[in-house]
Design a protein with these regions (language model features):
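Assembly/oligomerization interface modules of large self-assembling protein complexes
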Residues: 1-39
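Structured loops at beta-to-helix junctions and adjacent beta-edge loops in soluble globular domains
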Residues: 2-5, 44, 137-139, 172, ...
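Short helix/loop capping segments that flank catalytic or ligand/cofactor-binding pockets
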Residues: 9-13, 51-52, 143-146, 222-224
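Extended, low-charge hydrophobic alpha-helical regions
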Residues: 31-49, 140
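Acidic, glycine-rich loop-and-beta core segments that form the ion-binding/anion-interacting portion
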Residues: 41, 45, 49-105
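Extended oligomerization regions of viral-like shell subunits
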Residues: 81-217, 241-244
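Structural signal for terminal/edge beta-strands and the immediately following C-terminal loop/tail
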Residues: 222, 227-244
């Protein structure tokens, strides 16, 4: 259950009239079926015993980073089949539990007129606020976004302007190239069952002389509204030449 205060409203009436109606109007129920994100790493005991003292800690830190990256990819673009429904997916039209991509808004410029149309669509859904952000792949940021934001002053200084509509920019490799995901990240609901855990087994692979590390995370995610996020295609935006 999560609240949507921007669409809720209070009800005037006699002092002792039904107050439950007023409270429940601001809540929305979501049926979540948790999925598991998991993986394992087998490491030779000799590497741990003969390697640097920090190696065991590094392995655990690396597993955490891999799991976090996998979760980030699912939050942005998960298809909903035993994983979260990502920001870039429609919330209807699933086939065999796989949700389709949202239609992309094609942009040829990153100017006020182009971006304001998307902000107006968010406002139409009562989801436009000061926390709206633009999520973009780092490659696309440098090639398309940065290249169109930086200007040179008559004095020769370079000034990095904000986007015309003022959004903060979030860099994420989970976002496909030539794509912008626009919305308030807080309008994505991520339900988790406890923290991610990493268990170490020293005898499971005894004959192979290996330690086994197994990582598990239980959770699910979905946008709070079908129009919480809009996806823009910036393939047609002129930008920097990226060397191959």
């Amino acid at each position: 259950i999560f609240a949507k205060p921007n669409t809720a409203k209070g009800f005037w009436g006699p002092i002792c009239e039904d107050i439950k109606q007023m409270i429940l109007a601001g809540f929305q129920e979501v049926d979540l079926e948790s999925s598991r994100l998991s993986g394992f790493v087998a490491v030779c005991k000799g590497m741990i015993e003969l390697g640097p003292e920090w190696l065991a800690e590094y392995i655990v830190a690396l597993i955490y980073e891999i799991m976090a990256t996998s979760l980030e990819v699912a939050v942005v673009a998960g298809d909903g089949k035993n994983k979260p429904i990502g920001m870039t997916k429609q919330l209807s039209g699933a086939v065999d539990s796989v949700y389709p991509d949202k239609d992309k808004v094609k942009l040829t410029e990153l100017n006020a007129k182009s971006l304001a149309g998307i902000r107006a669509a968010l406002a139409e859904a009562n989801l436009d606020d000061a926390n709206v952000a633009v999520m973009v792949n780092p490659v696309t940021y440098w090639a398309k976004v940065f290249a169109n934001l930086v200007i040179q002053t008559p004095e020769g200084d370079f000034v990095n302007n904000r986007l015309a509509t003022g959004e903060d920019i979030i860099l994420s490799y989970a976002v496909p190239k030539d794509t912008l995901v626009i919305g308030n990240p807080q309008n994505y609901f991520l339900g988790v069952s406890g923290e991610m855990r990493i268990d170490k087994y020293t005898e499971t692979l005894a004959i192979e002389d290996m330690n086994l590390y197994i990582a598990k995370f239980y959770g699910y995610g979905i946008a709070k509204d079908p129009n919480a996020f809009f996806v823009a295609d910036v393939t047609g935006v002129a930008g920097a030449d990226v060397p191959k």
